[in-house]
Amino acid sequence: MAHFKPLGKKLRLAKALKQNRSVPIWVIIKTNRRFRDHPKRRHWRRTKLKA
């Protein structure tokens, strides 16, 4: 990836990075393990972004 990125692309990449987290422990406990993982989790090598 280029060192210089347009601001819009940088913001989209930052949003994707924040979205790509596991479900917090407190949510798993509170929902009685109903939500252990989320289906939109993305692996950097398998699925590429359209950013």
Curated annotation (Swiss-Prot):
It comes from the Archaea. It holds the Pfam family Ribosomal_L39. Signal peptide: none annotated. InterPro entries: Ribosomal_eL39 (IPR000077), Ribosomal_eL39_CS (IPR020083), Ribosomal_eL39_dom_sf (IPR023626). GO terms for biological process: translation. Keywords: Ribonucleoprotein, Ribosomal protein. GO terms for cellular component: ribonucleoprotein complex; ribosome. Transmembrane segments: none annotated. One of its GO terms (molecular function) is structural constituent of ribosome. Belongs to the eukaryotic ribosomal protein eL39 family. This is Large ribosomal subunit protein eL39. The gene is rpl39e.
